[in-house]
Amino acid sequence: MPATRARTGRWNADVTHYAILCVDRDVAWFAERRLDDCVSREITIRDIMSGEVACVEKVIAFNPAEHTADDVTADIAIAIARRLDPSDSVRSELLDFVETNAGLAFTRGLRRTELAFEAG
């Protein structure tokens, strides 16, 4: 009898899943994340804020059991903006994401991280 594979996570259709659509140089893909991470709004926000997921274009929330899907990009961008500390500098990509999806008002007072290059 063949050995059965252990399952690390179990898919549940009746929860909200968060798919992160990324785009870079006209190539689009959905970020590959653990199933447990995909059903957590908090982990989705954390992954975007930390840079774990880059080139974020959209965040789609869907529940297969309820046949619902929503573009929650603006909601996620607003949640991120509210967590940013004005005394810290913010990665350019993250600041652009918030500005594009939440609006300019949410980026006022935030500082962009400036990249420094050293001649060598």
What kind of region is each of these model predictions?
Residues 1-11, 113-120:
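Extended, compositionally biased eukaryotic interaction scaffolds
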Residues 16, 20-24, 60, 77, ...:
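N-terminal non-cleavable signal-anchor helices
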Residues 26-61:
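A short, charged, amphipathic alpha-helix used as a generic interaction element across diverse proteins
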Residues 51-92, 104-107:
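Short, mixed-charge low-complexity intrinsically disordered segments
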Residues 91-120:
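Intrinsically disordered, low-complexity terminal/linker regions enriched in Pro/Ser/Gly
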